[in-house]
Amino acid sequence: MAPPEVVNQTVRNGPHDLIIREQDVNGPKHAYVTFLAGDGDYVKGVIGLAKGLRKVKAAFPLVVAVLPDVPAEHRRVLVEQGCRVREIEPVFPPCTGKDSPFVRAYFVVNYCKLRLWEFVEYNKMIYMDADIQVFDNIDHLFDLPRGFFYGVVDCLCEMYGHPCPQKLPWPAQLGPQPSFYFNGGMFMFEPNLNTYNELLSKLGITPPTPFAEQDFLNMFFRDISKPIPPIYNLLVAMLWRHPEWVDLDKVKVVHYCVSGSKPWRYTGKEENMDRADIKMLVNKWWDIYNAFTPWI
């Protein structure tokens, strides 16, 4: 991932102004994108992702959509890693009262991903959560036909419907169940202001459901969703839930989404975290984070 040609933009960040890299008007038409909120340790995941993309010689930049509460120092580090930092405003679903409808309360912040459809200087973007690492070049995904929303089928053992015994029903308020249910941690989409406005309008009249923006995006794009192979988003839980579907030698993208599997927090003490394959994948992440030198 070559250092981007950029123009400077001043971002107001409390008492300090931060000069960040911004999209060059003649820049690339595709990009990778991730999302960061708050002042916690997820910035390490974004740094790791940026280094991973550079190591596999990705041809396109990594855009980091940040909420206003991401501190200036974190933004500065990301710029130093070659990221294009873009501040976005929060997005909130309709109020649901005191009780959270989400499987995990923090899922509510993930609705901010809808802002990514505003990034219309790009024709296509591949979104990846900050707890993802890329171990092989995936630029070729940008060559897939336009007009579709691409994602990897999620493991539904703890979600809805097939292929495992049903544990939670697909929310009736979201209409017909999609033909496949993709994971919201990695997907390819086409930024578009009309789509963006439709997303926000639909969100305003759609009650929140357990898996937050993942449910919502599955509902919204149900008619144009296309599956891509699981090698592009290996959920680490698949290693013990569906080992028959996993060939680690072919996996290009790993999603450290299970509790205890985040490499920068890893202790090996949580359930399933003492597995040899998990330890190997955590070590691979750290090899990139610690050893890869920027812009070489």
Q: In which residue ranges do the predicted regions lie?
A:
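Glycosyltransferase catalytic domains, chiefly GT-A lineage
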Residues: 1-296
